């Protein structure tokens, strides 16, 4: 397996698809990187030369925010929203949907699975 930016890329897939295994790189960015380096996007990952892998690493490190850096920036943005007490920040704190979805019945994805509470048992009559 080829290792780029701490991620093992599958060797039997096309490089265009393999690059999308890196957090922060989608299909369009992968195509953009390969066109910039003039690498055929239909080539398999195992067929890449070492020089090409080094070039891909350099471009990813210099030009893009990926993996841990991107996750850190996203979490800092969410924390900032919470500290300024914006509407979105409060919704994050409560674990509710942010973008105006209804919460009366369907918000299970955001709120998680149902947590049923056991009912109080009545004291036995004398």
From Swiss-Prot:
It comes from the Eukaryota. Belongs to the universal ribosomal protein uS13 family. GO terms for biological process: translation. Part of the 30S ribosomal subunit. It is found in: Plastid, Chloroplast. The gene is rps13. Located at the top of the head of the 30S subunit, it contacts several helices of the 16S rRNA. This is Small ribosomal subunit protein uS13c. Pfam families: Ribosomal_S13 (PF00416). One of its GO terms (molecular function) is structural constituent of ribosome. Its main location: plastid. It comes from Gracilaria tenuistipitata var. liui. Residues 95-126 are annotated as: Disordered. Keywords: Chloroplast, Plastid, Ribonucleoprotein, Ribosomal protein, RNA-binding, rRNA-binding. Residues 107-126 have a biased composition (Basic residues). GO terms for cellular component: chloroplast; cytosol; small ribosomal subunit.
